[in-house]
Amino acid sequence: MRKKTVQIMISHSLMIGLWASAFPGIRAGLEGYTPEHLALFRLLIGSMALLLFAVLTQMRLPDLKDIPAIFLLGFLGFAFYHILLNIGEKTVSAGVASLLVTTAPIFSAMLSRLFYKEHFGFTKWLGSMISLLGVLLIAFGAGDFTYSMSGILVILLAAFSESIYFVFQARYIKKYGFIPFVTFTIWGGTIPMLVFLPGLGEEMMNASISATLSIVYLGLLPTVIPYFALAYVTSFVGASEATLSLYVTPALALIISWLWIGEIPTLLSLLGGVVTVGGVCFTYLKVNKMNKIFITHFSAKRVKKL
């Protein structure tokens, strides 16, 4: 039991650390590559690593009827998401980008309400409004409002694209398993990205070694390993608890960005980030039933006295 607990803690650490490091890694990669080539190079490396893994584990391929949907989810969750995130990070700092991406759970909740009629109560709407206020604070704190706002909107669109991937993946994860599904969707996201292949070789020749190594790191580690770690943790504690620790990611991303690329966000941007993450957390706040009973009882008592 203790060994399993240690393994879960290590998995959580891998998820938080690797995903947090991806944001400054993108900024470092953009020093030598365009957003499109960076996304393609990163996904190619991840796809090749997963291809080797699939061969070694004799992974079963998806049914033909599921391939169009899996490829579409791969395009939205990986290709489109990474291109937009890379474009956004041209004008938005790595730390702020990581804070903006935490809005994905709110978009997921809204989509679940729209397509699956899941409950989207008052706390979720209020949390969404709080997060929107945080986004505005981030925009004002970034300096040139018009310049930074375009990058912020692009990253929010990336978060929305990723939320579509999260909402509609359930049936395929249930059918194929988490790791095979992630493998298939990364492949599905890589194939349409091949349209950007022309010019990649030339950029590799001209880019600095540090920029290229940053993308190799992104492709081998943050693109692949955290998903496997998430699958491992989910198998023991469930998806909700497994993803809960990901709210720590922006805080660590800010620290890594400072140490890796010397990026220091403004105080107003940090405040906006705290408000944004707070809004996301508030969106998923669950009021304890006993607290409801206590509040009702206390209110009734007070009315009686009056």
Curated annotation (Swiss-Prot):
Its main location: membrane. It comes from Bacillus subtilis (strain 168). Keywords: Cell membrane, Membrane, Repeat, Transmembrane, Transmembrane helix, Transport. Residues 17-140, 160-285 form the EamA domain. GO terms for cellular component: plasma membrane. The chain crosses the membrane at residues 6-26, 37-57, 67-87, 91-111, 125-145, 148-168, 177-197, 213-233, 251-271. The keyword Methyltransferase does not apply. Disulfide bonds: none annotated. It is a multi-pass membrane protein. The lineage of its organism: Bacteria, Bacillati, Bacillota, Bacilli, Bacillales. The keyword Signal does not apply. This is Uncharacterized transporter YdfC. Belongs to the EamA transporter family.
